[in-house]
């Protein structure tokens, strides 16, 4: 399914948040939506997801104009929004999480657990996953929780998935698991909007990019034609230079080394080295 958003405007009182913004997503395309905090990314995607309504502008799916007055209408049109804070219940099995709010029932009115498990298994088969639908969500690592959210979107027949900072709480191996799933979805013609500040990840997984700055679309194109430096410059509006800070004092021998330090759910995969005579900023 092809998406085009054209001339999208949105104001909150006197604050003009989106100024005639355009955005496009092709079938089976992973597009990075980039911008500093407050650039308008969330507002634009909340309009696509039916959470907000634009003041003006058009949303077209496969060339047909659409209006979404609620998230349910957006979802019915094939658009799923996976927020940064995952919407999963740890004390329920995977298959029940997959059907929250849309539980399948028998004629008797009781939950049809068998049918929900079967449908969940079919989605997992489509994605090449070996997860047991009856596994409790609390037993999953962060990457598989993200994958369960993606699976739920596919169960609802989503053709476009919006992912808001999907790798923020993931370790490098977990990120690779999620990226492997995204590559499969690309092959299955599912479009992905990938909202992220991690530009190296954008270069690795995305096909295209769109950059917003101060409510205006300032750049878009193919990822293969730009560098992370280019993307950062588009985002902030000026050249980004790296400065080496510090007192210049000579440091001594290594006194402390941390590698892959993790304490769920507070932090994970922390590396740190401290040397004698050094003041280390954290």
Question: Can you annotate each of these PLM segments?
Answer:
Residues 1-282:
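Glycine-rich phosphate-binding loops of nucleotide-dependent enzymes
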């Amino acid at each position: 399914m092809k998406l085009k958003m054209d001339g999208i405007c949105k104001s909150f009182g006197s604050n003009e948040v989106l100024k005639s913004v355009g955005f496009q997503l092709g079938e089976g395309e992973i597009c990075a939506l980039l911008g500093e905090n407050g650039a308008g990314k969330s507002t634009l995607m909340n309009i696509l997801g039916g959470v907000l309504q634009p003041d003006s502008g058009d949303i077209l799916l496969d060339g047909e104009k659409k209006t979404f007055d609620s998230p349910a209408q957006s979802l019915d049109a094939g658009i799923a929004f996976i927020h940064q804070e995952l919407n999963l219940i740890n004390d329920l099995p995977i298959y029940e999480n997959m059907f929250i709010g849309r539980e399948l029932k028998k004629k008797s009115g009781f939950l049809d657990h068998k049918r929900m498990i079967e449908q969940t298994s079919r989605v997992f088969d489509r994605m090449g996953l070996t997860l047991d639908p009856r596994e409790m969500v609390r037993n999953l690592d962060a990457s598989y929780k993200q994958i369960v959210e993606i699976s739920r979107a596919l169960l609802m027949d989503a053709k476009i998935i919006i992912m808001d900072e999907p790798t923020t709480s993931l370790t490098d191996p977990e990120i690779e698991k999620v990226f492997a799933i995204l590559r499969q979805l690309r092959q299955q013609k599912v479009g992905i909007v990938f909202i992220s500040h991690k530009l190296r990840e954008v270069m690795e997984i995305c096909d295209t990019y769109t950059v917003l700055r101060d409510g205006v679309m300032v750049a878009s194109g193919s990822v293969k034609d730009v560098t992370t430096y280019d993307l950062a410059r588009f985002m902030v509006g000026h050249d980004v230079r790296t400065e080496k800070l510090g007192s210049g004092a000579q440091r001594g021998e290594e006194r402390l080394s941390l590698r892959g330090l993790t304490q769920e759910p507070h932090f994970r995969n922390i590396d740190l080295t401290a040397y004698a005579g050094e003041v280390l900023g954290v």
